[in-house]
């Protein structure tokens, strides 16, 4: 059962775009609208992803930042994550306003992370590509990958774990260590079909088990 109605997802995507474009024009963070459903004021984790339009998924990313834990009300978290994704992702130069004409905005609303218990070697059996996102923690190192990333790259569960370890700056087999914590979460994902276009819920299709 969906927590986020389709119309709420559309609202969040439009809000994210407006937050970015207003910040790029004026340097100001917009305030959330007042007349929105109370559910969107609940604290939830959220990520905003910016993808270049008409570019293969593996090369499309232009920025992605968010909050894995529910520390802000969803509307405020969406505004902040959108701005950070546009100007503070250390992997990319800041987005320019004119670039937004060729960028598709995507919003992922996250469930709270759930620690994967049990022996490390059983972790691949406890996650599912097409459903779960992952967080890997070891010492001061942390890495997160959203559920859609594994689908877009065609990874299986072990590859997904290894890539999340890489994202954390750790060896790819660190998920086999007892002192590595692995969390899973799910996400409801909404994206523009094209820049400023209709917003749709993004389905995640698990890999076939051939």
UniProtKB/Swiss-Prot annotation:
Alphabetical list of InterPro entries matching this protein: AMMECR1, AMMECR1_dom_sf, AMMECR1_domain, AMMECR1_N, AmmeMemoSam_A, Uncharacterised_MJ0810
Species of the source: Pyrococcus furiosus (strain ATCC 43587 / DSM 3638 / JCM 8422 / Vc1)
Gene3D superfamilies to which the protein is assigned, alphabetical: Hypothetical protein ph0010, domain 1, Hypothetical protein ph0010, domain 2
Any Pfam family hit: AMMECR1
Protein name: Protein PF1979
Source domain of life: Archaea
Residues of the AMMECR1 domain: 7-201
